A protein has these predicted regions:
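Small/polar (Gly/Ser/Thr/Ala-rich) solvent-exposed segments
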Residues: 1-11, 15-20
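Secondary-structure boundary motif
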Residues: 3-7, 33-37, 104, 164, ...
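Short glycine/proline-rich turn/loop motifs
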Residues: 9-10, 77-84, 150-157
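PAPS-dependent sulfotransferase catalytic domain
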Residues: 18, 22-139
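The conserved 3'-phosphoadenosine-5'-phosphosulfate
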Residues: 49, 90, 100-197
Length: 197
């Protein structure tokens, strides 16, 4: 990765993966120290999506890549996920872990932390540009990438099981970002996740 940053003319670089959300405080400290040693500014960007919506979308994308996406298979896969609760999925929606780790390693001014559902607005976009120290450029607000809309009706019992699984996530975000209207921004989580606070 460091070799990519040494290329002539490189002024800004980004790297994104949901797996970064599971990094430990120690690993984040090491990453930060390595960047500081190279005199490279580091700005974490952490976007949280409605956790139930995120699981549904992720599952849909996986099934689409396997050419298995249909309503029956999608519902059954979500039902199975809500029972098995695989660690790989749980880690990626453990927003509490990520928020705590970021707060222990970085100054709040160095991070952009927000909800995915708020990103596509001029106010949030401006805040992101400010944190990254890049000039504001108006994006094409109409362009959508990797949209995974569906007309699949997910049974209430599956949504309730997903809600039970993801309740700690909603509680953590409420505690951290209580000023936000999560009922409006995360309607699925708000409806199906029991409040644990």
């Amino acid at each position: 990765f460091a070799s990519l940053l040494r290329r002539p003319g490189i002024q800004l670089s980004g790297d994104i993966t949901p797996s970064y959300s599971a990094l430990s405080v120690g690993t984040l400290k090491d990453i930060k120290a390595n960047f500081e040693q190279r005199q490279i500014g580091l700005r974490p960007v952490f976007l949280m999506r409605d956790p139930i919506e995120r699981i549904i979308s992720s599952q849909r994308m996986r099934l689409r890549k396997q050419n298995q996406l249909n309503q029956e298979v999608e519902v059954e896969a979500l039902r199975q996920l809500s029972v098995e609760r695989p660690e790989s999925v749980t880690l990626r929606s453990d927003y509490a872990h990520t928020l705590i780790a970021l707060n222990q390693v970085f100054d709040p001014s160095e991070c952009f932390i927000d909800l995915y559902e708020r990103l596509f607005s001029p106010t949030s976009w401006q805040r992101l540009c400010d944190v990254l120290n890049v000039p504001y450029e108006e994006p094409d607000w109409e362009q959508q990438v990797n949209v995974s809309r569906t007309d699949t009706s997910i049974p209430n019992e599956v949504l309730a099981a997903l809600g039970t699984w993801q309740a700690p996530t909603l509680t953590a975000v409420r505690q951290s970002m209580g000023h936000l209207d999560l009922a409006e921004l995360w309607p699925l989580a708000h409806r199906w996740c029991k409040d644990l606070s």
